[in-house]
Amino acid sequence: DISEFGGNPSGHSLNDVFKRLEYCSKPLVAAINGITLGGGLETALCCNYRIASKQAFVGLPEVNLGLLPGGGGTQRLPRLTGPSEALKMMLTGAHVSAKKALDMGIVDLLSENVVEDSIAFAKEKALKDSKHPMVRDLNDKMIEARGSENVLVEAQAIAAKSRKGQFAPGQIIKCVEAAINLDDFDEGLKKEGEYFLECLMHPQREAMIHIFFGERSASKISDVPKDTPTMDIKKAGIIGSGTMGGGIAMCFANAGIPVHIIDQDEDNLKRGLSVIEKNYDFMVGRGRMTSEQKDMVFGLISSSLDYKDLHDVDIAIEAVYENLDLKLDIFKSLDEHVQENAILASNTSGLDVDAIAAVTKRPEKVVGTHFFSPANIMRLLEVVRGEHTSHETLATVMSTSKKIKKAAVVSLNAPGFIGNRMLFNYTAQANMLLLEGALPHQIDQAIESFGLNMGPFRMMDLVGLDLGWRARQLSGVESPLHAKIGDHLCDNDRFGQKNGKGYYNYSEGSRAPNPAPENEEVYEKISS
């Protein structure tokens, strides 16, 4: 039980139980059905044989909790798959399909009737064989890996890229290194126990488990009953084909949900669709999808210039820039053209959702859905609950967020909601450091060395400096000192990655940030 990590252990140790299983005189067959992760898979690895249903998935995802597989997983899995594949599986926390698990050597057979076949298999082995294989004795792949540093170097590269700043990945690598180099399996288990205890005592473990439970509790809304009916979102509509609109459209298409984009400007629409296709081409080039998959997913996205073409969508999401008057006009048009039972959502990052709902005849169907840029990559989704938003609307959006692989958090209708209220002070302090003489790459490097994937200036360039700039222009209020940097950059056509120059410069076709010394004069001028 994850909630028990860090508590006082009681009873028999897991490894004592597993050792009894391994040395049982009768053949043990693990019948794997559904999703078998962590200790479940480690239990199966102690059995002599493993039979899985074709729909099963297995994995050792403890790294996601700041831990390592502490029930012998780091010692047994490499003996079946080889250390390289085991390390990839444990460092990524990936869930592996039954078919792939068979190919990797984790399971012995696949079955349509896993329980019946496992019982029959155990009886057959009991009658035929007196000795049964124990994973702990399979040393060939360990001996083969000795003397070669390639496996461990490759694992360290994976950890550095995908788990930057995390403690547990290094411990997992040390465990597998012990499995490779130690002749005594039980000595390897002792090393695993030592490294597991270090993970258990590390503050990252407590923080990552907090995140694990936090994400799950965020999806539960105390005053919305679990049995609240939800709509089936079969088709989505997006208003706006810019950075946000295109990214949101990709979220739905990636989930297999047809999506229709409309825009007032034909050139903008063509440009937006071109960006979407380039994003998919980039994924094909990186091996994240095949050309056939790209054609199928991109084929789910249609477009036009007319609100009437949204008549059959189940949810319409407005994704234009932050101008309340413009959004009010859009919602009036949506209310007129979209079917009566459809949800109307706004991707506003901080405007009044109740004011938007008030111009419609269905305020109970209006909700804020604040995606973070780039919407097709960032997991967080703020679901903004208006005064009249119904339980059904809220439950439907929360359910749909899981389908499009978002971690949804419900926010009340307050200025800036949750995320932007936090980011405001974060980016303000970053800009103040510029005015004190630090440079963007120095600040970003400091933040990234602490463990964040991206520093504040890389983040702002990715999101687009023009978003905040337009909002400040519309507010009519003079920008605070720290925001004048962004204003000046935008006044000089520096919007970030989208046009190749912001706090950094970007080469054509590249997202790698390069220093922009021409900006230093701006920082000095504003600070004086």
Question: Over which residues does each language-model region extend?
Answer:
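N-terminal glycine-rich phosphate-binding loop for ADP-containing cofactors
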Residues: 5, 9-13, 24, 36, ...
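Conserved catalytic cysteine-centered active-site region
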Residues: 18-30, 34
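Acidic/glycine-enriched connector segments
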Residues: 2, 17-23, 43
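Active-site-proximal alpha-helical scaffold in enzymes
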Residues: 40-43, 47-49
